[in-house]
Design a protein with these regions (language model features):
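A domain-level signal for the structural core that forms small-molecule/cofactor-binding pockets
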Residues: 2-73
Length: 73
């Protein structure tokens, strides 16, 4: 606990994804007072053409009450 899933468009390098995972892990540890061993981070690439149907509608619009940071689009 916790497990964080980041959905993003393809095209980011492995180095960028590893850095993002590291920074998310640090933020979770500092904010929630969890150990590094308790944090897991996954990345799921979603094509831009599929974003609306696979991410925006089911996970953003349909679950607005669970969002702590909404997108600006």
């Amino acid at each position: 606990m916790p497990h964080i899933l980041v959905k993003l468009w393809p095209g980011k390098t492995e180095q960028q994804k590893k850095k993002l995972a590291s920074e998310i892990t640090k933020a979770v540890m500092a904010t929630l007072d969890d150990s590094e061993e308790s944090v897991s981070v996954a990345m799921e690439e979603v094509k831009a053409a599929d974003w609306t149907e696979k991410v925006y509608k089911p996970e953003i619009l349909a679950k607005r009450d669970t969002l702590y940071k909404e997108p600006g689009y």
